Curated annotation (Swiss-Prot):
Entry-linked PANTHER family: FORMAMIDOPYRIMIDINE-DNA GLYCOSYLASE
Name by which UniProt lists this protein: Formamidopyrimidine-DNA glycosylase
Enzyme Commission number(s) of this protein: 3.2.2.23, 4.2.99.18
GO molecular-function term, one example from the UniProt record: class I DNA-(apurinic or apyrimidinic site) endonuclease activity
Cofactor note: Binds 1 zinc ion per subunit.
Length: 276
């Protein structure tokens, strides 16, 4: 699933391709992608102009005139790309926005898990999925005091805690494994048992890792591509994710992989301390 750095990269690369364009027609080939009534969705967006694209957590927010916002969640495999309207439809293309300038934006999703929800601008934070999201890394809301207080109330393990989007949004399996390794914390550690100095280090590593991953245009380990069809660069910097069975770059111990709440989790059994 695209995490915050990937979704932000999609936003940055997609914006110059579609900003200012007006929708002339919409083709919906797989209606379940649309949360609204598909006919109403088409009616409201036809002749509307894209003003800009914002993002919150893993959600893209397409801003239109007349106070409309399309909330788009890419889920596991969703991708946007600009094409000519006469380009043959791809097998996994499910929604097409044809613009008045003769170009078209298509949404491609192998698993069909992505969703688009048209709402009134200003109400998007009340929509399902977004309304319970916690703060993003590298924001004023995500400060050290907030993070310390949040962890002190959690009995569950730190891996599941960091994946909880109500605590901090935008982190997924890849970056959680990476920040826990950098912080030398075992993924099964009790969140509330981690020492204060280690929590501070973890907080700093979350912010730094997300910032660097975003600068590197995200991580491509499976199918992730930006709006220009280009891969990310952070996969070259991964230390544990995808490296189970290899030597830890810090101590040489063989990295292990376990399941944590059904999620594959790679860690160093020597470097990463288990706090109970």
């Amino acid at each position: 699933m695209p995490e915050m750095p990937e979704v932000e990269t999609v936003r940055r690369t997609l914006t110059p391709l579609v900003k200012g364009k007006t929708i002339a027609k919409i083709n919906i080939w797989y209606p379940k992608i649309i949360v609204n009534d598909p006919a109403e969705f088409v009616k409201k967006l036809t002749n509307k102009r894209i003003l800009k694209i914002d993002r919150y957590g893993k959600y893209l927010l397409f801003r239109f005139n007349d106070d409309l916002t399309m909330v788009s969640h890419l889920r596991m495999e969703g991708k946007y790309h600009l094409v000519s309207p006469d380009t043959p439809k791809g097998k996994h293309e499910h929604v097409e926005f044809i613009f008045t300038d003769g170009t078209a934006l298509r949404y491609d999703d192998v698993r069909k898990f992505g969703r688009m929800h048209l709402v009134e601008t200003g109400t998007e934070r009340k929509t399902t999925g977004i309304r319970h999201l916690g703060p993003e890394p590298n924001t004023a809301e995500f400060n050290l005091k907030y993070f310390v207080d949040a962890l002190s109330q959690k009995k569950k393990n730190i891996k599941n805690t960091l994946l909880d989007q109500t605590i901090v949004c935008g982190l997924g399996n890849i970056y959680v494994d990476e920040v826990l390794w950098k912080s030398k914390i075992h993924p099964l550690s009790s969140a509330k048992a981690i020492p204060a100095d280690k929590v501070k280090n973890l907080y700093q590593n979350i912010n730094h890792t997300i910032a660097i991953a975003t600068k590197e245009r995200g991580t491509t380990v499976h199918t992730y591509l930006d709006a220009n069809g280009e891969i990310g660069g952070y996969q070259k910097m991964l230390q544990v994710y995808g490296h189970a069975g290899e030597e830890c770059s810090s101590c040489g111990t063989i990295l292990e992989k376990i399941k944590v709440n059904g999620r594959g989790t790679t860690f160093c059994p020597h470097c990463q301390v288990l706090y109970k």
